[in-house]
């Protein structure tokens, strides 16, 4: 760890003692800076421009060196707006990459790309900082054992299980429950794994960032009374920020997550919303730096940039970073270079369905579209694999029969198909689950369902033992015992009504 060179504090050498350069050219967020001969900064060094603009306003802009141009000049990308900068202004080489605060003091706080708190709750109470550019863990440090990361969410654990230290793509439009699913995962990892979460908002709407913060406070994921008890750190570089900030904010969030993994030896959840915006920002910066564009106008370094981020997200012998990344697919074209490059790194996909959300089945995870490389008998065991396959087969058959049901009705189906439809409808409802973070909206207490309980429940439905129970008994319950208890209550209620 090193002291953050871009922030002043006791024991920090003042920036004035550092090497000075001068701005030679400004083109939007890109600065060319001239330095004295023999005193050139390294690639990725942080440069700071301090001074006053023409109306006397204080300027403090941090940039990152991207290219060494020759003739003692470097080209840097600004992390904030370059309004008010002028040629000839002094630029200070900090001598190190951007460094951000890490550790427990970051929990419950909101940061920008530079690691500065932006939540008006005062400075961060930590002296420990870490540079955002690091190499991925060496191969001998990796934990190569394939193990499932239990989330306590039935549909995820059974049909598209997450890998511990893996990368998951989260696909879904607006209003289908992405935010609530993310908050439930943050809550469950804290309770079941004693882990923490880091949320990186990359190039999305500022309103969404604000909504997420408010909902986290409401649901208790961020504890306002005792901020240290919070379970998540938030890092934002939203749509209104320059491309440099959007390109680097993912690394800022990842650096905070790496500290929890490597030093605190915890299981960490890293959320990136949206990974496409990371690629988009890299494309903008690449064009500004004058690089020749590649396919569809993307940067020629697309695979390298994506790899340098994704390779750092992994399990080591100390702890793990499991990453859930929202993926925007431009024009629904899965062959676009940005999503195609992302898919190469994913271990599982969780697809949220508007149709299920419209039926009121939450979480609205599509059991047929969601996939996972972990769903193999040698990894999850024969029992889990067989149960998952039978659930998918039953759901698929029900999907095929829906057109016939819509035209001719249930009565025209064969006895076997009627039984399949009945069980599939029970399965569909049993895949729903009350969430802890949604208690304040639904009034139903949240449920964490272990994997063994989940498998047992679906086996009982598939075996036909519960064919006599009504469908609504399976809706928004935890384990199968709650469904049978709910069925008895429904029976008592119907008798009382008579």
From Swiss-Prot:
Record GO cellular component, one term: proton-transporting ATP synthase complex
A Pfam family assignment: ATP-synt_ab_N
Keyword Aminoacyl-tRNA synthetase in record: no
One GO process term, biological-process aspect: proton motive force-driven mitochondrial ATP synthesis
Alphabetically ordered keywords of this record: ATP synthesis, ATP-binding, CF(1), Chloroplast, Hydrogen ion transport, Ion transport, Membrane, Nucleotide-binding, Plastid, Thylakoid, Translocase, Transport
EC number annotated for this UniProt entry: 7.1.2.2
Statement: the UniProt record of this protein carries the keyword Phosphoprotein: no
Intracellular or extracellular location(s): Plastid, Chloroplast thylakoid membrane
Membrane protein topology class: Peripheral membrane protein
Binding site for ATP: 172-179
Reaction equations catalysed: ATP + H2O + 4 H(+)(in) = ADP + phosphate + 5 H(+)(out)
Any one GO MF annotation of this record: proton-transporting ATP synthase activity, rotational mechanism
Enzyme class: translocase
Stretches of the chain forming a coiled coil according to its record: none
Record-linked HAMAP family: ATP_synth_beta_bact
Quaternary state and interactors: F-type ATPases have 2 components, CF(1) - the catalytic core - and CF(0) - the membrane proton channel. CF(1) has five subunits: alpha(3), beta(3), gamma(1), delta(1), epsilon(1). CF(0) has four main subunits: a(1), b(1), b'(1) and c(9-12).
The protein's role, per its UniProt record: Produces ATP from ADP in the presence of a proton gradient across the membrane. The catalytic sites are hosted primarily by the beta subunits.
Family label: Belongs to the ATPase alpha/beta chains family.
This protein's name: ATP synthase subunit beta, chloroplastic
Species this chain originates from: Chloranthus spicatus
């Amino acid at each position: 760890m090193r002291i953050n060179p871009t922030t002043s504090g006791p024991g920090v050498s003042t920036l004035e003692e550092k090497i000075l350069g001068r701005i030679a050219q400004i083109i939007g967020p890109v600065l060319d800076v001239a330095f004295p001969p023999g005193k050139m900064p390294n690639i990725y060094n942080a440069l700071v421009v301090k001074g006053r603009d023409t109306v006397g306003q204080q300027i403090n802009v941090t940039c990152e060196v991207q290219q060494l141009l020759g003739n003692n000049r470097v080209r840097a990308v600004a992390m904030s707006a370059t309004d008010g900068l002028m040629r000839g202004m002094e630029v200070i080489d900090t001598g190190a990459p951007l460094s951000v605060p890490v550790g427990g003091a970051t929990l419950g706080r909101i940061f920008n790309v530079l690691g500065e708190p932006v939540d008006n709750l005062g400075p961060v109470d930590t002296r420990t900082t870490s540079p955002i550019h690091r190499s991925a863990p060496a191969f001998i440090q990796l934990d190569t054992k394939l193990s499932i990361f239990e989330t306590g969410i039935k549909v995820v654990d059974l049909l598209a299980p997450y890998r511990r230290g893996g990368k998951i793509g989260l696909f879904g439009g607006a209003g289908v429950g992405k935010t609530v699913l993310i908050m439930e995962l943050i809550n469950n990892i804290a309770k079941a794994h004693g882990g923490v979460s880091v949320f990186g908002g990359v190039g999305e709407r500022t309103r969404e960032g604000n909504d997420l913060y408010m909902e986290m406070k409401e649901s208790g994921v961020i504890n306002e009374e005792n901020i240290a008890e919070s379970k998540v750190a938030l890092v934002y570089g939203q749509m209104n920020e320059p491309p440099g900030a959007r390109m680097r904010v993912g690394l800022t969030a990842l650096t905070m997550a790496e500290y929890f993994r490597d030093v605190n030896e915890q299981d960490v959840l890293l959320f990136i919303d949206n990974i496409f915006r990371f690629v988009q920002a890299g494309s903008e910066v690449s064009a500004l730096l004058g690089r020749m564009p590649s396919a569809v106008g993307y940067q020629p370094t697309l695979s390298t940039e994506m790899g340098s981020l994704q390779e750092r997200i992994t399990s080591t012998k100390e702890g793990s970073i499991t990453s859930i990344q929202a993926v925007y697919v431009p024009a629904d074209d899965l062959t676009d270079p940005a999503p195609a490059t992302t898919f190469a790194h994913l271990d599982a996909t969780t697809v949220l369905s508007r149709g299920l959300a419209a039926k009121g089945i939450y979480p609205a995870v599509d059991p047929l579209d969601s996939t996972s490389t972990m769903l193999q008998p040698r990894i999850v065991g024969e029992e889990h694999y067989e149960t998952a396959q039978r659930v998918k087969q039953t759901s698929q058959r029900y999907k095929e029969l829906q057109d016939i049901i819509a035209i001719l009705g249930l009565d025209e189906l064969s006895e076997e198909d009627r039984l399949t439809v009945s069980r599939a409808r029970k399965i569909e409802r049993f895949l729903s689950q009350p969430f802890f973070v949604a208690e304040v909206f639904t009034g139903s207490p949240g449920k964490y369902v272990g994997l063994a309980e989940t498998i047992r429940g679906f086996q009982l439905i598939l075996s036909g033992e519960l064919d006599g129970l009504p469908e609504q008994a399976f809706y928004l319950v935890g384990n199968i015992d709650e469904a049978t208890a709910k069925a008895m209550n429904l029976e008592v209620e119907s008798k009382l009504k008579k």
